[in-house]
Amino acid sequence: KVYKVGGAQAIAALAYGTESIPKVDKIVGPGNIYVALAKKAVYGFVSIDSIAGPSEILVLADETANPRFVAADLLSQAEHDEMASAILVTTSMELAEKVSAQTDAFVKELSRGEIIQKSLDNYGHILVAETMEDAIDAANSIASEHLEIVTANPFEVMTKIRNAGAIFIGEYSSEPLGDYFAGPNHVLPTNGTAKFFSPLSL
């Protein structure tokens, strides 16, 4: 059966049951902060997958990355909401500067520019590491929901990644592809919980 209902009220209906919606045993899937808090409140009455936070992306890049692609991918997450996180970790100061300039240019053109700007102001960061090993350490420490590896040797870098919800390899493996049709699923650990949680599975 399919019920057209959403938000915290849907979580309550599924957890406790109503006249028209039967009680369920497990609630899974992402939602906004109200859905996340509702899932936290009903945990114990029903099983849940996880309490997901705002969307996150970390792009791990070197000097070979295309700054327009990197900027676009960062903004693809920043547009979700004002609490979304978009982080670039790179070994190239030149790339960092170009990506910063490109994000500023893109924000002015986008319909959700105000939301994106607030997200970037609050949770957007560009980190420049001295070495790729330092950059990889930063990525593993942050343990982002989505990790893009845009380097000259992405498969080699991937072997050193321990903590990430989903990994996208190469400049043409854009994170939105995983959100909408190429990824195993859209329910991924956030807020550093990729260190000890896995994506939703059976």
Question: Where are the predicted features?
Answer:
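Short acidic-hydrophobic, aromatic-tinged amphipathic segments that line or gate anion-handling sites
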Residues: 2-6, 126-131
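Conserved NAD(P)+-binding/catalytic subdomain of aldehyde/semialdehyde dehydrogenases
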Residues: 2-85
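Short, solvent-exposed amphipathic alpha-helical segments in soluble enzyme
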Residues: 19, 43-45, 73-78, 102-106, ...
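A conserved active-site cap/scaffold subdomain adjacent to cofactor or substrate pockets
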Residues: 50-122, 126
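Short, well-ordered beta-strand elements within core beta-sheets of diverse protein domains
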Residues: 57-62, 88, 122-130, 143-149, ...
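C-terminal core of ALDH-fold dehydrogenases
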Residues: 141-202
